[in-house]
Regions:
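Hydrophobic alpha-helical transmembrane segments of multi-pass integral membrane proteins
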Residues: 1-273
């Protein structure tokens, strides 16, 4: 299994190197002319590939390894097709976006990428339910899958506005920020926390306080979206809910830091091995 995880994770790291290289090109074009590359198109390719080819690919790999160490020994065989499909859509986007922007092939690959994420969410949720023991890490992973699916509302609403020729700047930005918020603060954050909590579980750290921390972060994630669009006129009640969600997130972090502080010596010993 180690070689399987290593193989897939090396691909993710290779994709990170590609992300970094494109980032260098983007900065190079600020000072020097590369007329055969459109800055705006290249930026789209960079961002889409960073999300799908680097972060999502890495998280999927690590989450599948979680299933493996939890007793599902055929996990990588089962998820191989989804991991390959995610790579295909990611490479498709990093090629098509710089060439045509939001053209036909770029839209096809980005749409397929969303459907791959649906497939992963559905399969992984089912496999989590097959783990009979009650682990707090399962909560975080399920939260990440929920927000991964929710985030797709952003690009689909954007596609609808473009197709109906009803594109308004505020709604355009709101759709983009919707996707970004539920990717960063939902899918990415909750998946990373799930991996961290799993590591703490393996160390034998008592994690009951993490149940509360999860509930606070999960409850605050949806209303916290409005922190990204405060320039849109919103009702005073919604504004108050947004403030409360920020405070709830802060309290969730306090609970997390209290747990880390209470187990700092055990963490030092285990992480130094």
């Amino acid at each position: 299994m180690v070689s399987e995880v290593s193989r897939w994770f090396r691909i993710s790291l290779l994709n990170l190197a590609i992300v970094a290289f494109i980032g260098v090109l983007l900065r190079y074009k600020i000072a020097f002319s590369l007329p055969f590359l459109d800055q705006h198109y290249l930026l789209h390719g960079h961002s889409h590939f960073a999300f799908a080819g680097w972060i999502t690919q890495a998280l999927m790999t690590l989450m599948v390894s979680y299933l493996f160490v939890s007793g599902q020994t055929s996990a990588f065989k089962k998820y191989r097709n989804l991991l390959v499909l995610n790579l295909i859509t990611a490479y498709g986007m990093v090629i098509s976006f710089p060439l045509q922007g939001y053209g036909f092939f770029a839209i096809v690959f980005s749409t397929l990428s969303i459907f791959v994420s649906y497939g992963f969410a559905f399969s992984f949720w089912k496999d989590l339910n097959e783990l009979k023991d009650e682990r707090i890490s399962k909560w975080w992973f399920k939260g990440s899958l929920i927000f991964s699916v929710i985030s797709s509302i952003g690009p689909f609403s954007l596609s609808y506005m473009m197709a109906s020729d009803n594109l308004h700047e505020k709604w355009y930005l709101a759709s983009i920020y919707f996707f970004l918020h539920f990717q960063y603060n939902g899918w990415f954050f909750f998946a990373c926390m799930g991996l961290l909590v799993h590591r703490l579980e393996l160390m034998g750290i008592h994690l009951d306080i993490f149940k509360k921390s999860f509930l606070y972060f999960f409850a605050a994630c949806i209303p916290a979206y409005f922190l990204s669009v405060l320039w849109i006129p919103i009702h005073t009640i919604i504004y108050l809910i947004v403030i409360i969600s920020a405070l709830v997130q802060m309290y969730g972090w306090i609970l997390f830091l209290k747990l880390i502080r209470a187990n700092i010596e055990k963490l030092k010993i285990n992480l130094s091995k």
